[in-house]
From Swiss-Prot:
Subcellular location: Nucleus
GO function terms (MF aspect): DNA binding; DNA-binding transcription factor activity
CDD domains per record: PB1_NLP (cd06407)
Keyword Oxidoreductase in annotation: no
InterPro entries to which the protein is assigned, alphabetical: NLP, NLP1-9_GAF, PB1-like, PB1_dom, PB1_NLP, RWP-RK_dom
Domain PB1: 862-945
Species whose genome carries this gene: Arabidopsis thaliana
Name assigned to this protein: Protein NLP2
GO cellular component: nucleus
The entry's keywords: DNA-binding, Nucleus, Transcription, Transcription regulation
Low complexity bias locations: 756-794
Gene Ontology BP terms: regulation of DNA-templated transcription
Function noted in UniProt: Probable transcription factor.
Length: 963
């Protein structure tokens, strides 16, 4: 016998590291090493070994015929590796012939251009290649890496499926194997003639099995054709599962039509590896007729079944060392309570259904089914102890996230780790599963918009965690999402506190919209997969039929390699709000499926109707989108543009609509509410006047003094002048003569001419009384308007005295110019700035939060509160979205009060008197006093409840819309 010497015409070259052995005694370990690598065996007496070898192969591959399961198919062959010299021996069982063009798993070493050594070792184990020559006969014994039974990959997969059969035999499961073949010069995955199992009670699974046999999926790395679910798993070497295959797009799951017809729902696919090798040998697929969110039992069962036959699926091969985890855990677990407390606060204040904390798996010491040596350092997963789930339905999504780890770059969380930016997705369910792997689970849980925020280490600025906030399920409107995004960003800026972590306020924010990848697939993939016939991708023009759509402009800009930004502009003294916009997760081209794409973009089309501007900027090679303008030409960076209508809407025009709601006024003027709010801010109006005030205890004179104290007002503003255009309304308590109700919208062009100029308001009636968008009554006597504040106050006082039996509430308009504190840094909730390029940070001149001193009040609506309970005192921020109940909870939490009900809250008013705070109306009045007095802090005292309780608040109506 000689080892390691090539010769003859054999197809395989032996290992030639060892020379010819001498006749001396050899070390047995060295001999084992030699045989382990393979060797040639040669005879010199001319005796043929064909018959002997055929018998050996047949004996080694014979199956046990006692296992007669008509729904479990496995095929064992002694392969004809050298057609000129070896006859094909069948095993003891008879099987249908394999059609020409389909190669068997044992032929992989010759036909599939993967890792030849690894494939040969698994597929050629215990197989022999013979050569004949005049001098004798020789044959090659291939190396055997497996320490398990002498069997092929297919044999072992059959055994593994038999083991799975015991676990799922009574369930509605179809288990099938996909193995690689070569056809027409391309590599494919096929399940035809491969092992499979299904429960015969479910005829739909039998039909779906027949459908799957007709499909071949490409297994080439550089293919642009649809690879399907098995192909993705095979190429990426990562498992993939979905709760419902109907959520796939047709290019992601070409069998989707047949799956719907066969009532197929859940699907799980795992790659199969030889133990100790990184070469993927095939894919195990499980489908079921039920919708499944949790596949952990099936994952564990498949992994155990594969390990029992010396195969494996994905797993972590190199977990972090114990020393690393011990050092990191000191930092890691110290930060979790801080993160959890902050997420709890945010979820309670904004009514979020879910808030997740993500961290690298390596730093958690967490293992998962998607791990490998190559990606373990890039894998991230949820920190379950730091996830807040107020919504019960969202708990299933948390379980899915804990089970399905993400790689850096996948989803907005993976991108936040990778790019160190804030990422916002208006609708997560519109993304493909490749771009957002948890999109299907989010759809079942009813989740939509999400924001990913990276948390950095204060010492080295590395990203330690990523927080993922899911917006309320009802927050679907673009404007509502914008308001929520700004308000939530203000909270992130102002209220996050940690010893070791911080949120970088100079980060950019990217708003990500879905864009399809260009893929090609055939209706009959078995016929056309190799030729590519009748597979034409839809052109870009078919994706969006309307050239005016800002989505189509954005897509075209992205296709040309241009950056795209989304901006909301405010007044000149405020920084421009600008959001980075990416049209997908990578730079893939846009392809087929225009109908579905349009449906995904419908939610953003509303913005166009509100006056969204699109600017193609040649200097930046970017598209800028802003509120309030139509399609314009290029402009230089930093320039501001306004529509003619917006420029010409003055204070006189606004006054005509103060009696009604802000939304009605916006509709009448012809702008969206957001634009109207901005116009009001330009005129110094920070809150729409027609809101409901609950108490009459403060005179209009005090309000007039506040208004007069504001610098920069052009001309004197009198309170009674705001209501001269109120509609007439008859009242038995009023002395007015008019009895008809006149609609202020009856003015020409709603108070604005066709050219956008203000129409002259009608002369005011001598006396009028009106109900303003609620139950509050507003009165004015404008026959002889006076600029004297005392006259206005006396007039209202006289009316109140004459109508003591009527319910009369104080009417007041808060008019403050935005020039107050111009030099002070604007709050994030109003001036959040997101720039397209790195030189424009997320926050222009971002406010730094001092570590050991209280922060200045910002202009975003948040209020400082100082609460006292006995000798204890605390300070905190009253967010603009809080109500009385949230204030109670925060005070109870700060003072560790289990039940706040037995306690009374009192606030210090402008007369230095303690007034009970019992409801929303009282809280609103408290905030009004705080703002009117220019006080920096709201003072609240907590007392034990008194025996005598006062009656309910007079007219509890909520605050008007905040500007």
């Amino acid at each position: 016998m000689e080892g390691g010497r090539g010769g003859g015409d054999g197809n395989f070259l032996p290992n030639s590291n060892f020379g010819v052995f001498s006749d001396s005694a050899m070390d047995m370990d060295f001999m084992d090493e030699l045989l382990f690598d393979g060797c040639w065996l040669e005879t010199t007496d001319g005796k043929s070994l064909k018959q002997t070898m055929g018998q050996q192969v047949s004996d080694s591959t014979t199956m046990n015929d006692n296992n007669n399961n008509s729904y479990l198919y496995g095929y064992q062959y002694a392969e004809n590796l050298s057609q000129d010299h070896i006859s094909n021996e069948e095993t003891g069982r008879k099987f249908p012939p394999i059609p020409p063009g389909f190669l068997k798993i044992e032929d992989l070493s010759n036909q599939v251009p993967f890792d030849q050594s690894a494939v040969m070792s698994s597929a050629q184990a215990e197989k022999f290649l013979l050569e004949e020559s005049e001098g004798g006969r020789r044959y090659w014994i291939a190396p055997r890496t497996s320490q398990g039974p002498s069997s092929s990959v297919k044999e072992r997969l059959v055994q593994a499926i038999e083991g799975l059969n015991e676990e799922v035999q009574d369930k509605d499961f179809l288990i099938q194997i996909w193995l690689p073949i070569q056809q027409e010069g391309k590599n494919f995955l096929t399940t035809s003639e491969q092992p499979h199992f299904f429960n015969p009670k479910y005829s739909s699974l039998k039909r779906y099995r027949d459908v799957s046999v007709a499909y071949n999926f490409l297994a080439d790395e550089d293919s642009k054709e649809s690879v399907g679910l098995p192909g993705r798993v095979f190429l990426k070497k990562l498992p993939e599962w979905t709760p419902d295959v109907r959520f796939f797009r047709s290019e992601e799951y070409p069998r989707i039509k047949e799956a719907e017809q066969c009532d197929v729902r859940g699907s799980l696919a795992l790659p199969v590896f030889e133990r100790g090798s990184g070469t993927c040998l095939g894919v195990v697929e499980i489908v079921t007729t039920t919708q499944k969110m949790n596949y952990r039992p099936e994952l564990d069962n498949i992994c155990k079944a594969l390990e029992s036959v010396n195969l494996r699926s994905s797993r972590s091969l190199n977990p972090p060392s114990r020393e690393f985890l011990q050092v990191y855990n000191e930092f890691y677990y110290a930060a979790l309570p801080e993160v959890s407390e902050f997420l709890t606060l945010v979820c309670r204040v904004y009514d979020l259904p879910l808030a997740l904390t993500w961290a690298p798996c390596a730093r958690q010491g967490k293992v998962g089914s998607r791990h490998s040596d190559e990606n373990f350092s890039e894998c991230v997963s949820t920190v379950d102890d730091a996830c807040i789930v107020p919504d019960h339905q969202s708990r299933h999504f948390l379980e899915a996230c804990s089970e399905h780890h993400l790689l850096q770059g996948e989803g907005i969380v993976g991108k936040a780790f990778n790019a160190t930016k804030l990422f916002f997705v208006p609708e997560v369910t519109t993304f493909s599963k490749t771009n957002y792997p948890l999109a299907h689970h989010a759809k079942i849980s009813g989740l939509h918009a999400a924001l990913a925020v990276p948390l950095k280490n204060k010492f080295n600025s590395s990203v330690e965690f990523v927080l993922e906030f899911f917006f309320p399920k009802a927050c679907l409107d673009t404007e509502a999402q914008q308001d929520m995004l700004k308000s939530l960003s203000a909270t992130l800026q102002q209220d996050f506190r940690s010893l070791n972590l911080f949120i970088d306020k100079e980060l950019e924010l990217e708003v990500v919209f879905p864009v399809r990848e260009e893929v090609v697939f055939a209706e009959n993939p078995l016929i056309n997969a190799g030729t590519g016939e009748d597979m034409k991708p839809l052109p870009l023009e078919e994706i969006s039929q309307e050239d005016s759509s800002w989505i189509s402009h954005m897509i075209k800009a992205n296709e040309k390699g241009k950056g795209v930004s989304l901006s909301w502009e405010y007044q000149k003294e405020e920084p421009k709000e600008e959001f980075m916009l990416t049209s997908g997760w990578d730079n893939n081209q846009i392809g087929s499926g225009h109908n579905n794409f349009l449906s995904e973009a419908e939610q953003f089309q509303k913005v166009t109707n509100s006056g969204l501007r699109i600017d193609m900027d040649p200097s930046f090679e970017s598209a800028s989108f802003g509120v309030g303008q139509t399609l314009l030409g290029s402009r230089r960076p930093g320039e501001k543009r306004r529509t003619k209508t917006e420029k010409t809407i003055g204070l006189e025009v606004l006054r005509q609509y103060f009696a009604g709601s802000l939304k009605d006024a916006a509709k009448s003027i012809g702008v969206c509410p957001t634009t109207l709010k901005r116009i009001c801010r330009q005129h110094g109006i920070t809150r729409w006047p027609s809101r409901k005030i609950k108490k009459v205890g403060h005179s209009l004179k005090k309000l007039q003094l506040v208004i007069d104290s504001v610098q920069g007002v052009q001309g004197s503003i009198q309170l009674d002048s705001f209501y001269t255009s109120f509609p007439e309304l008859s009242s038995p308590h009023m002395s007015g003569t008019g009895t008809s109700f006149k609609n202020p919208n009856a003015q020409t062009e709603n108070g604005v001419s066709a050219q956008g100029t203000a129409a002259a308001p009608k002369s005011p009636p001598s006396s009028s009384c009106s109900h303003s968008s609620g139950s509050s009554t507003c009165c004015s006597t404008g026959a002889n308007q006076s600029t004297n504040t005392g006259t206005t106050s006396n007039t209202v006082t006289t009316l109140m005295a004459e109508n003591a039996s009527a319910i009369l509430k104080r009417a007041r308009s808060e008019v403050r110019l935005h020039t107050m504190n111009q030099d002070e840094t604007k709050s994030l909730s109003r001036t959040l700035s997101h720039k397209t390029f790195s030189e424009h940070p997320l926050f222009e001149n971002p406010p730094r939060l001092p570590e050991n001193s209280s922060r200045k009040l910002k202009a975003g609506g948040a209020s400082k509160v100082k609460a006292t309970f006995g000798e204890a005192k605390v300070r905190f921020t009253l967010l603009p979205t809080w109500g009385f109940r949230e204030l109670q909870h925060e005070i109870a939490r700060r003072f560790n009060i289990d039940n706040i009900a037995p306690f009374d809250l009192k606030y210090l008013d402008d007369d230095k008197e303690w007034v009970l705070l019992t409801c929303e109306a009282d809280l609103e009045e408290c905030i009004d006093i705080y703002r009117s007095s220019q006080s920096r802090t709201i003072k609240i005292s907590v007392h034990e409840a008194s025996q005598v309780k006062l009656g309910g608040s007079f007219g509890s109506i909520g605050l008007g819309p905040s500007l």
